[in-house]
Amino acid sequence: MIINVDLHIHSHFSGATSTSMTIETLAREAPRKGIDVVATGDCLHSEWQREIKQCERIDEGTFLLGETRFILTTEVEDKNRVHHLLLFPSFSSVDDFKERITKFSSNIETDGRPNVSLNGEQIAEFAKDVDALIGPAHAFTPWTAMYAYHDSLSSCYGDLTRYISFLELGLSADSNYGDRISELHRLTFLTNSDAHSPYPVRLAREFNRMSVKEATYREIKNAILRKNGNSVTLNVGLPPQEGKYNESACISCFRHYTLDEAVKRRWRCICGGRIKKGVRDRVNELADLPVPKHPEYRPPYLHIIPLAEIIAKALGQNSTFTKKVTKRWTELVDAFGSEVNILLDADIEEISKVTVPAVTEAIKAFREGKVIIHPGGGGRYGTIELPNEEERDTVRDKQKTLSDFLKT
């Protein structure tokens, strides 16, 4: 069977998250985004564990509420500020891991994403001891990421490097970025939302499509490990330019710089602010290949833009959270079942019967690959621009649909 999976989110017990990130809200919103299985996130937190345990238990590591299945995950920050994503097979595994790291953390009961005074190798060793999967979260982001503080997997994970089975690309990178680095060719790439709110523009803005026997932790683990015929068949995510850190830019005024310009200015903007190195430039530093070389098993990468963002631009709204945007998003999802279906597969003529012409034209422009993206940087997301009439007539590569990948 084919499932869509988002393996990195946070609960309302993590810092800077929405109070709406409850298990009930996630269970309700995931199907509207087209997602079958969602990470719990924050599973080390005692109060969040109590919410998770309200769900029906399918097996030791899989839980069900409504139409949505959950698997146990958390993110932790090590002593070098590197973030690691962990997936657990059961609550007993979670409890065992928590017992081992509690003495190294001062906020394990107060923050869903705890800080621990251990390095990546030590955390990976504990993960291995409890049979949990572990890999770098948003690996290229210039804050709190592996490649922000290390130049290689082994620098981060030491003797446990071979135990690392996956790498989360993050919003500012895709497979073409990752596969310019040879040491990553053996790893499964994951594309996850890292959602801090359940809003349509956040939850499942990136997700993975997997071929599994059933929608359970064990089968998802086998897909990540590429065992027993299971696999990740598609990575779905933002174009890298939409990420907050794609290009090098000032974190104060968001002025963009080339790498040479930033170096000459000693990473100080003309406004006096700090220039933060972008993912594109960091990959260029790390890459040992001039162009990406994808291993045979690497799935295609499908770029999507959140539907709420497309609607907001079509309606001339400055925010994706306005009542007008929410109304149009809701009427489309109610009519076609999920955001993924609307963006990629639903008949455009049928869409035109449900929404206003401006939104229909915007979705059509996205499908035709005519949406213009202005890169993000310095902590500000990239922005999109809809084509003018002349640009609408320009022939470009058509946006692929999920059905194009059914045979992968």
Describe the role of every protein-language-model region.
Residues 8-12, 138, 196:
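Histidine-centered divalent metal-coordination motifs
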